Every structure is written in structure tokens, then in C-alpha cells.
Amino acid sequence: MVLDADLGLANVDVMLGLRAGRNLSHVLAGLCELKDIIIEGPYGVKIIPSASGTQNMAELTPAQHAGLIRAFGNLQDEIDFFIVDTAAGISDMVLSFARAAQDIVIVVCDEPTSITDAYALMKILSREYDIQRFKIVANMVRSYREGRDLFIKLTRVTERFLDANLELAACIPLDDNVRQAVKRQKLVVEAFPHTPAALALNSLASKAMTWPIPHHPGGHLEFFVERLLVHKPRAMEAPICE
């Protein structure tokens, strides 16, 4: 199951050529239940669509946010993996989902803005929430070596300034077939299954199947609600001085 949690510019359903009648904004408004908006995509993947371009979806109150997560806890569907696709940056919404996740996978390109965003996210999660383990996906690289070099660049910075443990999860090649798949509104692994990006993504999926499940309660949606209610929003906390 995939939650499109880029709550301001959600578009997973559009990219896959699916038509979502209702979305998370209708759930928040009390017009329907979460189970009513779930749509099925390729290979049986279930998708929870968000509301693209709706400002209040990107600025949920703590009460709305908690209610939304409780709705996830009430789902009866059998879920193998629950993937949360967040926006870039360090908004409270991104941080909340990251804190609830069992594994945090950071997708980064070899560009200054992408590297800066990745480091900023790891910095806040490490220093403010005591999260040290991050999986890195080097995206749109020209070779495995370029992806490895990007990972080493990130590792050197985090080792110097943060108490963080990074793992290179995958290197996804720069592949024009990804763009072509988006134009066709299909998954690249479906439209072009034997291309470099598709093979790399399949390899990442197989690798994810072997990731160990932590023994602590983190990663459960009910635990997410508890954490959300215990921690104050960052805007209410005293600023942290460097």
C-alpha cells in the first residue's frame, strides 16, 4: 500500500493513470471513511490518494493529523508493506511520518539542493528525535560509482557533524525510460521492465524484502499517534541554537 503523503502536490494516482473519486481531504471533512478512497493500481498495489494543490491538506492541525493516522489503524486490509511517499523538505508533516516509519529511505540526487535537503532532514531527525539509521537511494546517477561517490559524500558530512548511520540501499540509473513511462502513465517496471532503472528498482524491492523488522514498537501506526500527541509541534518548541 502506498500513501501519497506529498499533501500539497499529490499526484501518484495521476502518474499511474488512475481516477480517484475521493481523497484524503474528504476523509478529513468526515464525508467518507479511509477505506472508501483506496484505489487499486498495477500488480495489486493499493493507493491512498491525497488532494493535489489543496493548501489545508499540507497544513493539518495536530488533531486532524492524529485522526487521519487513527483511520489508518482501523484499516482491515492485509498490508505487506506500507510505503509513505512524502514531500521533500523538513515540514512538520514530513518529520511526523518519518518518526513513525520503520525504515527511513532518503532519495537523493547529486545536486546541491537535493544533498542539502537530505542532510537537513537527517540532522533534525538525529538531533531532535534521536533517529540515527537512514537508508540512502542515490537517484539518477550515471553509474554505480557515481552513486557510491554521492553516498560517500553524504557519509563524510554526517560522520563529522551527526550521530547517524547511513546505508546505501540502491543506485538508480539516469534512464530516459522513466520519463517515457510517466508520459504513458505507467510504472517503469511495467512499461519497460528490462531497462536499467526498472532492473535497479526491482533489485531494491527484493532487497527491501530482507530488511529486518525492528523489535521496538516504532513503525506501527498506533505508535505514531502516541508519538504525535506526546511531542509538541516544532513551532511551539524553543529554537535550538547551534
What are these regions (language model features)?
Residues 5-77, 182-187:
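P-loop/Walker-type NTP enzyme "switch/lid" segment
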Residues 81, 86-180:
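Conserved catalytic-core segment of NTP-binding enzymes
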Residues 182-201:
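C-terminal boundary of histidine-terminating zinc-finger modules
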Residues 1-4, 107:
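Short beta-strand "acidic-cap" motif of Rossmann-like dinucleotide-binding folds
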Residues 4, 12, 27, 48, ...:
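Residue-level signature of catalytic and energy-coupling elements of molecular machines
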Residues 17-22, 124-125, 152-155, 188-189:
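Short, hinge-like loop/turn segments at secondary-structure boundaries
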Residues 216-242:
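A short, charged, Gly/Pro-tolerant segment at domain boundaries
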Residues 196-212:
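Extended, charge-rich low-complexity interaction segments
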